[in-house]
Every structure is written in structure tokens, then in C-alpha cells.
């Protein structure tokens, strides 16, 4: 990711897509050009947003999400670097990506063991770890952070100002 000359593009479907969108937002917030690619629109023209200098991160707990097929084929055809995050070692994503990150299979925390909960928490953790590792490599600092966060409670935390409050 550090050597990416273009953008870091994140994609996924369902809850994995929500995690992908969050990781892309985190990367943007530290000054790394990034966006979320909606896999349902990718094969309807949005693949044109990808460039050979980009790095693509695909999120899919099963690793076999059919909506990601066209993105994988396109990235392989045009030699776009891919990172795949999934939990099945024989899955399409793990087999097809340049850098496969294999997650352990986990039992979901809900009463029926099917609602993405433990798996999404783990996927979010891996995505955030990638972002933190990139920040360390970039020698990311508070001064750099201030550039991208001039407003809100995060800005208040480093400016020592107070947020306006509304009283009733």
C-alpha cells in the first residue's frame, strides 16, 4: 500500500462493503487518496475509475462474493495490485489476489450464529491495522492529521477550543 502511486480502492458487498467503505474513509482522512467502489456498479462502467497505479482492497468474509468477480477479472487483466481479505483459503479472492490476507473462521456472536458480527469486527480490525501500519510507514503526525481535520470534535481535541453547545 505504501508504494501505491495511484489511489487505494476498497470494495466489498453487504456488511463487508460497509467495512470497505469505512477503511477507505480512514485512508482518505490520513491523506491517502482512496475511494469505495460499489461492486454492483463496477461492471456497469465504474471499472473505469480504476487505474494500473492503484491498489485494490477486496473485502469478503466468504471470499466467494460473485459481485466481485468482474472487479477481480478487470484488475488482473490490467495488472492492478490487489489485496484480498477473506476467510476461506480456497476462495476466489484468496486465490486471485496478489496479496491474500486469510482471516480465521469465527462463530458469529448472535443467538443463531449467522448475523455478521464477530466476522465484521475482525475484518474491521484487519482493515484498521493496515491503515495504522501505513500511518507508521508514512511517519504520520498530529500536524499532518490537523490538515485533514479542521472541524469537529477531533479538531477541538488538538486546538483546545470548545465546541458550541445548545442549551434548552
Mark where each language-model region is.
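Glycine-rich phosphate-binding loops that contact phosphosugars or nucleotide phosphates
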Residues: 2, 7-13, 17-138
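Single conserved hydrophobic/aromatic residue that forms the stacking wall/gate
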Residues: 160-168
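Internal, active-site/partner-interface "lid" segment
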Residues: 109, 136-161
